[in-house]
Curated annotation (Swiss-Prot):
One of its GO terms (molecular function) is metal ion binding. This is Phosphoribosylformylglycinamidine synthase. In the N-terminal section; belongs to the FGAMS family. Mg(2+) binds at D702, E741, N745, D941. CDD domains: GATase1_FGAR_AT, PurL_repeat1, PurL_repeat2. It comes from the Bacteria. One of its GO terms (cellular component) is cytoplasm. One of its GO terms (biological process) is 'de novo' IMP biosynthetic process. Keywords: ATP-binding, Cytoplasm, Glutamine amidotransferase, Ligase, Magnesium, Metal-binding, Nucleotide-binding, Purine biosynthesis.
Length: 1348
């Protein structure tokens, strides 16, 4: 084994942060350093070139510890597994000609003062590594165990009389009637079950997978109910089936879209083309991933996003994920640097991550997966809620809600799956099996705390988004074949792993199957049959393909370097047989064999006829109806709880000034910027409305909007509605308000009719907790039987998660909060009434929670509305409220921020509600008609924080003050400002007042509408009523309260200096924001004369595995008059394509090789370390008639090729952003005078651009290089000065440098993404006078002009 040491693994501030956390455990412990370490095993009998390895890894031979007093610990991938990093890095090194069997990366951590006590050592070890995916070693030599091949685990038989014990030992979460069912079925089979059969049954029949409660029969308060919960949900679709193409029968629902043309490469030639405009469709799906996020926030949220993405991809015969949404509900954050008066200390569950850790790490996990996969995340919500309900019981989200959803494109001819036929191949597409996520379906179906801690961690999956991107590229290619798509039917692999996905695949087609476990790709040879069959390793799909097309399918996968295995065959007999070495004699001897060798003949009809007589009993040999047959049906007997006892908030003693600041500072109301800027929102080039709005880029949009294609202004919109705290007082009202809020949010988009809106309903509850079952039934009935039918709304898709409670027993010394970033308060800080008693059982129970996501096709996206106030001197703000004159405060944020330390805070009273559904219909039609009539300048819905929060957010977004007048609102200023009834604030020009008032009257909403405020240019917000000023705030004071959570969270999570700089920029009332300036006319098509000749030069749209920005890049070149071709690096390596045939190439953005060697370095290494490929690129660059463009990941890659690019010798490398965070921003660029052929005639322009990268900070070898480099683009502020302040300069590059060119201008590299905004409508904000073409399209037209 060779050991090399690389660069420091921690930046100074992250090192200091880790040391602080270590010292909270062991005060004398010192962190003296942390370095990347590489462990390399060569092929037997061969020696790799060490100099080459050092060059590729940027590493040196490992020295001795740098501090003699230090004790070194090595964090390495879990022994016995192969990390995703290793598989990619090993592939790179082999491609570079190195005889490497495997390379792994670890981290050497040097510590002084290593503790002697076992408890302290265990606590430190837990902080240093994740035991699910990592091992902690005491020496580098011990890492030799990484390369050991352990013996596989064995199959176990479980005696029928031991099923109850196995239920607990294996964490099966089976009910007694299910155990009795299994005992009866296996007794009839005459044998004991195998452990793998029990685990498979438990996963396939878990509450998570089979939704037993939603399908149960019900008795409420002694009265039998006619309908199940699911039947009431289906009632909405039965009443309003129009516009829905698929409901309840697939991985996602499919709804009608607008006519559009797909733009994609021809699968035969690789040339990109716009297909004919046809009626389109889109898939919609929203999942939750609550249990894994509670246990391990980053991977839990990441795999939640990944699983939902796979659902969209596996819809019909193949969909294309397009835009995502994310949401979180947690308990109080308790930020150490931002204590809040409503956050009373209490004991927390030591087996679950606290809310602060969840919100520091979970959003990063979800964002990272979306970013690397290449799906923009355009929508979200965040709620923090916690309320005491008596000794030992808290109503809170200790078990969080982690929402992951989105919409995806799907061709109409791919919506219906085709049944598998006997003889069809059963394929596993994607990554290898590993011992992760074992039993996740069952684990997420029980209350947190009811299972063993080891089982909790075993149930959490781990993510590899770059692998999922490769799978999606395979799916896209198959779909592009149209009706000739080789995929008949497929599922994503989620809960239960292959043990759930493959039986579902077969059962849905009415067939059985024989599966060879020896063919299942695995990176862990120690896996037992149970572990191999049931683990939930991510980024996998199962699909059926005719055997006659296996070679074709294999070629598609090989081009994308996407692993797949033909693991079995469908049979006519409906029996599932699973064993080892089923199809190949060699497999029976070695346990491995060729995973894609020939399968049995298609005419096979019997499972037994395919299986040779085994030497030992089969792991699985069951009739399919054991899994999918008549398992016991659940019955729920529920009773309504007593009326809530929380007192009513008395507003008479409150201070209005203080109340406004508190409400804005509550995390549910406060700025979500820290959750938004970590996620890419522009990838794909079809975004028309993201969260950020206006020149000052604040995250205040009410909904998200995407374009249906590159050449239409129609598209799709989505929004979220949720008002979960209200359920503690009125569950039905909470559900109605969730639906209402989703609609009022969606009104900002040009949706034409209510019946075109389709809802996803995500239901959460603590099933079994006293009264909660009845409240859940009330909520479902209110929506499914009453509200949605009345409004012609349907719910074709959804999800339930009904174990939303956590319980634990207090041990000695557990007196307060203590986990992760959150310090433990002393016992004296907790009121006596809240002090837990050792041995006491504590419980946290969430409210009944409905999260509604609304989706709809939209017409002209240019007519969308945002909260950005137009700077009209003569305008006013109107409130349209749907509360029928009521101003109910029960459950409001105002009540929450005045929750005191008493046992029952003043949270109660009557809640907001949608008393009259038709009033919401009238509101929807009013806003639609007013928008189409050009009467609305701005729009913002009223929600948490009431009209006061909505008004302040509009003022923040627009850098304006407000004069608010309450005279027409009633006598109680608190009720007027802070009630959270449904409604919206709109801006109307004075000249349109009469026309708007007339429209309001025509829609019978005159009693609901009132003029409430005027925008001003003064930095203050003033509230007046009854002839006097009731309160007045400085604009900055209100903004600081609203920004406080983002600032505090960024300081904990990111570079604290960057957080301080952003706050200074954001709170500056006088800041100019984005202030574009153009020196050319974007509507002038300078390439038109050249295009008119009919000549269309060929350009290669170059991508490597993990690249995700090729489609929008190709569109820009095609639009400018080129023939754009999809060229994978494997095409060049294997000689299918020659770079010499192209006039230019564009290296696209993404995460090539998952950036395992640093951003773009893996891609560059694959070129530089292959002599033939290096020569081909060098020859291309040397030609005087070629050009090259590198964007983002392509920029990083080309910067590593500077030695073979003439005139690029002074280019920098690109390192981690100064904020140490992925940055997704709209920034202002200045086009600098340079030789770049792409930027001719643009110098001096200042143009907004999408930025999305984690490693964009330019670093030059020397000051001479920086001075000599040909800078083409730089970040500037709104006044045109070079930007040095974050986030105006989002990556911290010197002098704002973010684009460079070669001395002759033929090679240009840039970190921002101009290719994502070919049309003005793609920009987050642009001046009103800009036409259809974005200024950035000029770059590509310039390239066409240069080609002649």
């Amino acid at each position: 084994m060779m050991v090399l040491e690389g660069a420091s693994a921690l930046s100074p501030f992250r090192r200091a942060r880790l040391e602080t956390r270590l010292q909270t455990l062991v005060p004398a412990l010192r962190l003296t350093g942390a370095w990347h370490v590489y462990f390399i095993r060569a092929d037997a009998g061969r020696t790799p070139d060490q100099a080459t390895l050092q060059r590729i890894l940027q590493a040196e031979p490992a020295p001795a510890p740098r501090d003699e007093a230090a004790s070194s610990r090595y964090v390495v991938p879990r022994l016995g597994t192969l990390s995703p990093w290793s598989s990619k890095a090993t592939e790179l090194m082999r491609g570079a000609g190195q005889p490497i069997q495997r390379v792994e990366r670890g981290t050497r951590i040097d510590l002084a003062g290593w503790p002697e006590g076992e408890a302290d050592q265990a606590a430190v070890a837990k902080l240093l590594h994740d035991p699910m995916t990592q091992s902690l070693l005491g020496s580098a030599a011990a890492a030799e165990a990484l390369f050991n091949v352990p013996d596989p685990g064995q199959l176990e038989r479980i005696p029928l009389d031991a099923l109850e014990q196995a239920n607990g030992d294996l964490g099966l979460a089976l009910a007694q009637d299910e155990i009795d069912y299994l005992r009866e079925r296996f007794a009839a089979l005459g044998r004991d079950p195998a452990d793998v059969e029990l685990m498979m049954f438990a996963q396939a029949n878990s509450e998570h997978c089979r939704h037993k409660i939603f399908n149960a029969s019900w008795t409420i308060d002694g009265k039998p109910q006619e309908r199940s919960l699911f039947r009431m949900i289906k009632h909405t679709h039965q009443q309003t089936p129009q516009h829905t193409l698929s409901a309840y029968s697939d991985n996602a629902a499919v709804v009608e879209g607008v006519p559009a043309a797909r733009f994609r490469p021809d699968p035969a030639t690789g040339e990109y083309r716009s297909e004919a405009v046809v009626p389109s469709a889109f898939a919609i799906k929203v999942e939750t991933h609550n249990h894994p996020t509670a246990i391990a926030p980053f991977p839990g949220a990441a795999t939640g996003a990944g699983g939902e993405i796979r659902d969209e991809g596996a819809t019909g015969r193949g969909g294309k994920p397009k835009a995502g949404l994310t949401g979180f509900s947690v308990s109080h954050l308790r930020i150490p640097t931002l204590p809040q008066p409503w956050e009373a200390p209490r004991a927390l569950n030591p087996r679950m991550a606290p809310a602060l850790d969840i919100m520091l790490d979970g959003p990063l996990g979800g964002a990272a997966f979306n970013n690397e996969f290449g799906r923009p995340n355009l929508l979200g919500y965040f709620r923090s809620f916690e309320l005491a309900e008596g000794q030992g019981l808290t109503r809170a989200y200790d078990k969080p809600i982690m929402l992951a959803g989105g919409l995806g494109a799907i061709d109409r001819n791919q919506v219906e799956k085709l049944r598998l036929q006997p003889g069809d191949a059963v394929i596993v597409l994607g990554g290898p099996a590993m011992l992760i996520g074992l039993g996740g379906g069952a684990a997420s179906s029980v209350a947190a705390g009811d299972s063993a801690e080891a089982l909790d961690f075993a149930s959490v999956q781990r993510e590899n988004p770059e692998m999922e991107r490769r799978c999606q590229e395979v799916i896209d290619h198959c779909v592009a074949l149209g009706t000739d798509n080789p995929i008949r039917w497929f599922h994503d692999v989620g809960a239960g792993g292959l043990s759930n996905a493959i039986p579902e695949l077969l059962h849905d087609s009415g067939v059985g199957g024989v599966i060879d476990l020896a063919r299942v790709p695995s990176d862990d040879p120690s896996l037992s049959p149970l572990e191999l069959w049931c683990n939930e390793s991510q980024e996998r799909y199962v699909l059926g393909v005719p055997q006659a097309r296996l070679d074709e399918f294999a070629a598609i996968c090989a081009r994308e370097r996407c692993p797949f295995a033909a693991v079995g065959v469908a049979t006519a007999e409906e029996r599932l047989v699973v064993g080892y070495g089923v199809f190949d004699a060699a497999n029976r001897e070695s346990g491995i064999g060729n995973r894609n060798s020939a399968l049995p003949a298609a005419e096979a009809a019997s499972a037994h006829s395919l299986f040779p007589t085994p030497d030992s009993p089969l792991p699985i040999n069951l009739p399919m109806d054991v899994l999918f047959g008549k398992a016991p049906k659940m019955h729920r007997d529920a009773v309504h709880p007593a009326a809530p006892q929380w007192p009513v908030l008395q507003t008479g003693a409150l201070d209005l000034q203080e109340a406004g600041l508190r409400v804005l500072a509550h995390p549910t109301v406060a700025s979500k910027s820290f959750l938004v800027t970590i996620g890419d929102r522009s990838v794909g080039g079809l975004t028309a409305r993201e969260q950020m709005i206006g020149p000052w880029q604040l995250p205040l949009a009410d909904c998200a909007i995407t374009l249906a294609g590159f050449e239409t202004f129609d598209g799709e919109a989505m929004s979220i509605g949720e008002r979960t705290p209200l359920a503690l007082l009125n569950a039905a009202a909470s559900a109605r308000m969730a639906v209402g809020e989703a609609i009022t949010n969606l009104c900002a988009a040009p949706v034409q009719t209510l019946d075109s809106i389709k809802l996803s309903a995500n239901w959460m509850a603590a099933a079994g907790h006293a009264g909660e079952d009845a409240l859940l039934y009330d909520a479902v009935r209110a929506v499914g039987m009453e509200l949605c039918p009345a409004l012609e709304l349907s719910i074709p898709v959804g999800k339930d998660s009904l174990s939303m409670q956590a319980q634990w027993q207090v041990g000695n010394g557990e007196s307060g909060i203590g986990n992760g970033e959150t310090p433990a308060p002393s016992a004296s800080a907790i009121p006596d009434s809240r002090l837990p008693i050792p041995g006491e059982t504590l419980k946290s129970v969430s409210p009944v929670s409905l999260i509604i996501s609304a989706f709809a096709p939209v017409s002209d996206v240019r007519t969308q509305l945002t909260p950005l106030l137009q700077r009209e001197d003569e305008s006013e703000l109107w409130l349209i409220g749907l509360g029928g004159g009521k101003q109910r405060l029960g459950g409001s944020v105002l009540a929450q921020v005045y929750a005191d330390d008493s046992a029952l805070p003043a949270f109660g009273g009557e809640t907001p509600d949608l008393d009259d559904p038709q009033r919401l219909r009238q509101f929807f039609e009013l806003i639609r008609d007013a928008r189409e009539g050009g009467l609305l300048l701005a729009y913002h819905d009223r929600s948490d924080g009431g009209a006061f929060a909505a008004l302040c957010e509009m003022a923040f977004a627009s850098r304006q003050g407000l004069d608010i007048t309450l005279d027409a609102w009633g006598d109680d200023a608190f009720r007027s400002l802070f009630n959270e009834e449904l409604g919206a604030v709109v801006q109307i020009a004075n000249e349109d007042r009469a026309a708007f008032a007339d429209l309001v009257e025509r829609h019978a909403l005159t009693e609901c509408a009132q003029r409430i405020a005027r925008p001003t240019g003064t930095p203050r917000v003033r509230v007046s009523g009854q002839g006097r000023v009731l309160a007045e705030w400085r604009w900055e004071a209100l903004f600081d309260a609203w920004w406080s959570v983002t600032h505090a969270m960024q300081k904990l999570r990111d570079n604290p200096d960057s957080a301080d700089e952003e706050r200074a920029v954001a709170r500056n009332f006088q800041a100019p924001g984005l202030r574009p300036k153009l020196v050319f006319d974007p509507s002038e098509d300078v390439a038109a004369p050249f295009v008119a000749t009919g000549a269309r030069p060929k350009v290669a749209i170059l991508r490597e595995q993990g690249v995700n920005g090729q489609i929008e890049m190709a569109y820009n070149f095609e639009r400018a008059g080129f023939r754009a071709f999809d060229v994978h690096m494997s095409d060049l390596i294997e000689g299918r394509v020659d770079l010499a045939q192209f006039a230019g190439f564009a290296a696209c953005g993404g995460f090539s090789y998952g950036d395992v060697l640093g951003a773009g370095r893996g891609w560059a290494t694959s070129i530089l370390e292959r002599a033939a490929l290096r020569d081909a690129f060098a020859a291309f660059f040397a030609r005087s008639d070629t050009f090259a463009l590198g964007v983002c990941n392509g920029c990083q890659m080309l910067s590593q090729l500077k030695d073979i690019i003439p005139g690029a010798e002074h280019w920098p490398r690109f390192l981690r952003n100064r904020s140490e965070q992925f940055e997704a921003r709209t920034a202002l660029l200045e086009v600098v005078e340079s030789p770049s052929i792409l930027l001719r005639g643009m110098a001096g322009s200042r143009i907004p651009v999408a930025v999305a990268h984690g490693e964009g900070r330019a670093e030059f070898d020397t000051a001479v290089d920086q001075a000599a480099a040909r800078v083409a683009l730089r970040f500037i502020d709104g006044d045109g000065a070079v930007a040095s302040q974050y986030p105006l300069n989002p990556n911290g590059s010197p002098d704002g440098i973010t684009g460079l060119t070669s001395t002759d201008g033929r090679a240009t590299i840039l970190m921002p993404h101009p290719e994502r905004t070919p049309r003005s409508v793609n920009l987050s904000w642009h001046p009103a006078g800009w036409g259809e073409d974005s200024p950035w399209l000029r770059m590509f037209r310039n390239a066409r002009v240069w080609c002649g």
